[in-house]
Amino acid sequence: MTPFMTEDFLLDTEFARRLYHDYAKDQPIFDYHCHLPPQQIAENYRFKNLYDIWLKGDHYKWRAMRTNGVPERLCTGDASDREKFDAWAATVPHTIGNPLYHWTHLELRRPFGITGKLLSPKTADEIWNQCNDLLAQDAFSARGIMQQMNVKMVGTTDDPIDSLEHHATIAKDSAFTVKVLPSWRPDKAFNIEQATFADYMAKLAEVSDTDIRRFSDLQTALTKRLDHFAAHGCKVSDHALDVVLFAEASESELNAILSRRLAGETLSGHEIAQFKTAVLVWLGAEYARRGWVQQYHIGALRNNNQRQFRLLGPDVGFDSINDRPLAEELSKLLSKQNEENLLPKTILYCLNPRDNEVLGTMIGNFQGEGMPGKMQFGSGWWFNDQKDGMERQMTQLAQLGLLSRFVGMLTDSRSFLSYTRHEYFRRILCQMIGRWVEAGEAPADIDLLGEMVKNICFNNARDYFAIELH
């Protein structure tokens, strides 16, 4: 019987252990996509307690707690921090088999140093006090944890109208060695069907000093904001394409669509597709000219529980996997961007694992320009961010493309404790390659495979995003 979560956790062959301990473990972290609040990094936020850093805003935990029968008051409601933590501690023993069980104990181990102890109602008091004592120390501030975890770069997620003042504050501090850069997330600028679209256009008009009436006005406003982001070091964009749409339109059609929507009219599905296509194609060309990377997160079905959406708002654990077809429309969108050789470096993520092979083969259609891995099939995302999901994504990438050119893991997280997800990924990667070697499916060449592992863990992302590190 193998003990739980030793130093060789998940490393079930000697070759996997060598790969992890000698090549993967000490690689820095290049976290190119996350949802950390830049204000907390700028202010070097000190966390009040373990709830503040660990449970606050974590919809993964809330979903598990609700499933365990925990009342909403103890998830997102007005209960005390300690009450909410105790509700989580009572839920953890029920999460065996869920990645939350592994994540929880990896996060207690690093950075808190808690090993050989499982979170449960019996241990809750001891773990609460031990972690809170550590959180009072300088090394456990927002910046302190990032430095402890050997983070070199994080890409936050930012709206085009954001001032980026916190990124500017961070950049001025030469004593802080982690590169914290904004990522451009323009969803509100192309989700024309949303009830908030006209209000958002007014905000965009104000911050860009542009009167937005025609499609060219929108392009002018967005160009000004792209320049603003570029001035703050931005090299990455991100888009939530819950459904992939494609429909071409003339400029006069786009002007009419925008004008009617700003006047409060309801658009047809075809008109919505025309507008979104035009914005994404134009943005893609802008990214290509600037040398940026674009990311498409495809296939979320959001806000399914309308009652809870009205009570609590978005992003609180009521989203799931969509099953809309995506191949043909995505192909048309990428091909349109590529017509004038203005398809930027692109990372595609799918929420439905059914679509893994679709994306794994789609990226092969648009590789080239002498750039290794220009088109990427992104790491297992959200509900696939677990052992089986990561294994499937990497196996299919290896079979359909080049695993050796993969840009690797990202946290996609709102928590400063999520950096151990990089460790989890690295262990799974080394386990997978070690099993190939054990089965005679890959050569037992530690130099060859060790270098490949180092590249996937850090070097490929560093080179792909072309961001100068401290």
Swiss-Prot record:
Pathway: Carbohydrate metabolism; pentose and glucuronate interconversion. GO terms for molecular function: glucuronate isomerase activity. Pfam families: UxaC. One of its GO terms (biological process) is D-galacturonate catabolic process. Its EC number is 5.3.1.12. It catalyses: D-glucuronate = D-fructuronate; aldehydo-D-galacturonate = keto-D-tagaturonate. Keywords: Isomerase. It comes from the Bacteria. The keyword Isomerase applies. NCBIfam families: PRK02925.1. Belongs to the metallo-dependent hydrolases superfamily. Uronate isomerase family. This is Uronate isomerase.
